[in-house]
Swiss-Prot record:
Gene Ontology terms: cellular component: mitochondrial inner membrane; respiratory chain complex I
Gene: mt-nd1
GO biological process: aerobic respiration; mitochondrial electron transport, NADH to ubiquinone; mitochondrial respiratory chain complex I assembly
Designated name of the protein: NADH-ubiquinone oxidoreductase chain 1
Main location: mitochondrion
PANTHER family according to UniProt: NADH DEHYDROGENASE SUBUNIT 1, NADH-UBIQUINONE OXIDOREDUCTASE CHAIN 1
């Protein structure tokens, strides 16, 4: 009985801090955008607006969940629930001091779950029975699938550099030197691709207000809309945490778990702030430019980098030992 309770409580204790971080990320985003546009941002609810995310959450969840009469009711409700479930599950194998799951193929697990998120977007757009929602969903799916190719190839390069699929191997590899130093072109492409993968500005074509109102979640209101929003921001935090681990900024304090956690929090926060900075600074890309960027620029470069990382160790096999 105690084991069952532990298996229920552990994931809950893991998810609550993530959801709290997501809530306050929305507040930080509004504050950052406010100050960059020479205004205050939220500053009424609580001291300097600190309780604003809680007020927003309560407001959304007590609203009546309006569903279009012509929509596919079951799929309409499953899509946001599945989106949040996937966004939470993807955090499980992270190499925290006391992680929830230690997977041998942790990187492939992340890649597989991030690919599954496409189905929630497609399901929500199709089940809404709205032209705008469907067009937004198709755009999002095409964009996500396109950039996943680049992300997969960059991950392959990192795996070959580190020599393993586990997060612990990647962390140990970076004890002496961050991988951003030998792999800075991949770091730049990874960061831009994560912006596109999470549908953030300047790649937020899925919610182009001028043509699509709000994109794939146009028919959602109240609780289901809040679930989509939580999933989106959880994925942003996840991608930045992954950038910290794999991309190139990881470091291992295996004997000092507190330092590991603090290091992860600080670096992920800085990378998330850059996401917000990019949103405040850049206009939205045109859709054809978005696709040209990945298929005509990023894909050839990442393929060349992959071939380089495969061929270099093979070509060095004949050299005598340097030790």
């Amino acid at each position: 009985m105690l084991t069952i309770i532990t298996h229920l409580i552990n994931p809950l204790l893991y998810m609550i801090p993530i959801l709290l971080a997501v809530a306050f990320l929305t507040l930080i985003e509004r504050k950052v955008l406010g100050y960059m546009q020479h205004r205050k941002g939220p500053n009424i609810v609580g001291p300097t607006g600190l309780i604003q995310p809680i007020a927003d959450g309560v407001k959304l969840f007590i609203k009546e969940p309006v569903r279009p009469s012509t929509s596919s009711q079951t799929m309409f409700l499953i899509a946001p629930t599945m989106a949040l479930a996937l966004a939470m599950s993807i955090w499980a194998p992270l190499p925290m001091p006391f992680s929830l799951a230690d997977l041998n193929l942790g990187i492939l697990f992340i890649l597989a779950l991030s690919s599954l998120a496409v189905y929630t977007i497609l399901g929500s757009g199709w089940s809404s029975n709205s032209k705008y929602a469907l067009i937004g969903a198709l755009r999002a799916v095409a964009q996500t699938i396109s950039y996943e190719v680049t992300l997969g190839l960059i991950l392959l390069c990192m795996i070959m550099l580190a020599g393993g699929f586990t997060y612990t191997t990647l962390m140990t590899t970076q004890e002496q030197m961050w991988l951003i130093i030998p792999g800075w072109p991949m770091a730049a492409m990874w960061y831009i691709s994560t912006l596109a993968e999470t549908n953030r500005a300047p790649f937020d074509l899925t919610e182009g207000e001028s043509e699509l109102v709000s994109g794939f979640n146009v028919e959602y209101a109240g609780g289901p809309f809040a679930l989509f929003s939580l999933a989106e921001y959880a994925n942003i935090l996840m991608m930045n945490t992954l950038s910290y681990l794999i991309l190139f900024l990881g470091s291992s304090f295996m004997n000092q778990p507190e330092l590991t956690t603090i290091s992860l929090m600080i670096k992920s926060s800085i990378l998330s702030m850059i996401f917000l900075w990019v949103r405040a600074s850049y206009p939205r890309f045109r859709y054809d430019q978005l696709m040209h960027l990945v298929w005509k620029n990023f894909l050839p470069i990442t393929l060349a980098m992959t071939l380089w990382h495969i061929s270099l160790p093979i070509s060095m096999l004949g050299l005598p030992s340097q030790t």
